[in-house]
Design a protein with these regions (language model features):
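Conserved, mostly hydrophobic/aromatic
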Residues: 16, 83, 130, 154
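Structural preference for beta-strand elements that scaffold enzyme active sites
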Residues: 2-4, 23, 54-56, 89-92, ...
């Protein structure tokens, strides 16, 4: 089982590494917004910590919905390129339409930007669809779309507030995916 821990700074990445995390997801403003795109410098610094499977970088310009204006889409595509250039082992991205489906043209552009920058940097990167997945109306059709777009994994709580409540759905998604894409259970934990 791969353990990925969301962090928002170098200290968090170091602690995650020391405690045995396989990889980290780097986000800014994690607790206030659910995570935003971190700075180029923060990505570089965290990429040097030595986490075995590296740093996955959340690309998200603001909190709130995952329906983005054209200007926000442009920013995210540029941020994907910058994150890979800064040393990210992958990016965590996504967008949806007002009617609860994946924004396919935008999501394709994000994945292509990541792969193109990876080629330019002469390394492989992973592309993950973030928890906007839990808000999609037809998650099985969404999995087919993400597989077609070449995504590595999808983050989901199974549509529940916490993973244990979503275990049944996680099992269904995993069976449907049948190894074509990784279903990664995720949750938000805050210490008491």
């Amino acid at each position: 089982m791969t353990v990925e821990i969301a962090v928002q700074d170098v200290e968090g990445a170091r602690i995650a590494h020391e405690e045995g995390a396989d990889r980290v997801e780097l986000c800014a403003a994690l607790m206030g917004t659910g995570g935003l795109t971190p700075s180029f410098g923060m990505i570089q610094a965290c990429s040097h910590v030595g986490v075995p499977q590296g740093v996955q970088v959340l690309i998200r310009p603001r909190g709130g919905s995952f329906v983005f204006a054209d200007e926000e889409k442009y920013v995210q595509i540029a941020d994907v390129r910058s994150a890979i250039l800064a040393g990210a082992s992958g990016v965590v991205v996504g967008g949806m339409t007002e009617d609860g489906r994946i924004d396919v043209p935008f999501t394709r552009a994000l994945a292509e930007a990541a792969r193109n920058e990876a080629v330019r940097c002469n390394r492989k990167v992973q592309v993950t669809y973030h928890r906007a997945f839990d808000m999609l109306d037809d998650q099985f059709a969404a999995l087919d779309t993400l597989i077609e777009l070449g995504f590595t994994r999808v983050l989901t709580s199974g549509g529940a507030a916490c993973v244990p409540d979503g275990l049944g759905r996680l099992r269904e998604l995993s069976e449907y995916a049948a190894g074509r894409i990784q279903i990664q259970a995720c949750l938000l934990y805050t210490s008491p």
